[in-house]
Amino acid sequence: MSLASLSVSPGKGRRVVVGMSGGVDSSVTAWLLKQQGYEVIGLFMKNWEDDDDSEYCSTRQDLLDAASVADLVGVDFEYVNFAAEYKDRVFAEFLREYSAGRTPNPDVLCNAEIKFKAFLDHAMTLGAEHIATGHYARVRAIAGAHGREYQLLKALDGSKDQSYFLHRLNQAQLSRTLFPLGEIHKTEVRRIAHDIGLHNAAKKDSTGICFIGERPFREFLNRYLPTEPGDILTPQGQRVGRHHGLSFYTLGQRKGLGVGGVKGSQRDDGTADAWYVARKDLQHNILYVVQGHDHPWLLSNRLQALDASWVAGRAPELRGYGAKTRYRQADAACVLEQASQGAFELSFSQPQWAVTPGQSAVLYDGDVCLGGGIIA
């Protein structure tokens, strides 16, 4: 894709507010939309009140990066603080889920409640017709039974597709959303950033919890949840260690268990299989671990999901689909056996590994993301 080929004008002066994080993806998003004729306003969202100096410095640098890009691209730039909304709508639920022994995905809730709700509402007060972000996904308008309908699709760059995190978006949100990066690959995004002289062209992608950053997770969680150490047991009841609190562990976890030196089953060559978290017993505060990646306790043929959210506003028909139970997982063949506005059940053709309560099960029909729910 050449830069010249991007100089078209489908925007025709329409106003769009771009969520600018200071990273390369949102920066190129703003530039692309400006090239397409949109009236672009860049908006930096502060969604976490900094509680240490290093995080303050990181957030400040991101803000400076975003403002610098807006100046280079030639768009207006604003700053808004959504910390109160994030705390009430996302972080409180995040802590409730961990307290209940589940492993939530705050990025899913953050997208639904902050980036595409609080941000969208604010953009509308600025007279915008659309919002845009640097997510790798696509939106497609089709003729539905009751008029125009919007579909959420995977990005063309499958290695960067983020539709999994966006599956809770509804028709109203999708109708106002643009994902310019959904049609191009990440390598092209960095090339564009380099060609137009963006100083953050080589900036590392963020991988931390949504708006909390890349800090030691156990240390962070320990500030908000009480620790209650307990026993680590095998399925046979053998005590192999002590845990720091069930909230700090997730199904399938291998590192940080402190049981590496414990003898268990061994292979023919005398080496031992790794230990994995397999279950949590909240009532008795017991963490169960098993040896071997493919231990039966780690495999599931079925799942139930609650708090279902369907992109089309209605549950899909009962038939075969693909599903993800974690990000970056290949779609697993499954059958949707029961579905309603509030819950659904899936059966899988092949056993699924470490299906984790609190994570999202997301349903796909080819490239079309149908929605999903929270694994029970």
From Swiss-Prot:
SUPFAM superfamilies: Adenine nucleotide alpha hydrolases-like (SSF52402). Disulfide bonds join C110-C210. Residues 105-107 are annotated as: Interaction with target base in tRNA. The keyword 4Fe-4S does not apply. Residues 160-162, 326-327 are annotated as: Interaction with tRNA. Catalyzes the 2-thiolation of uridine at the wobble position (U34) of tRNA, leading to the formation of s(2)U34. This is tRNA-specific 2-thiouridylase MnmA. The gene is mnmA.
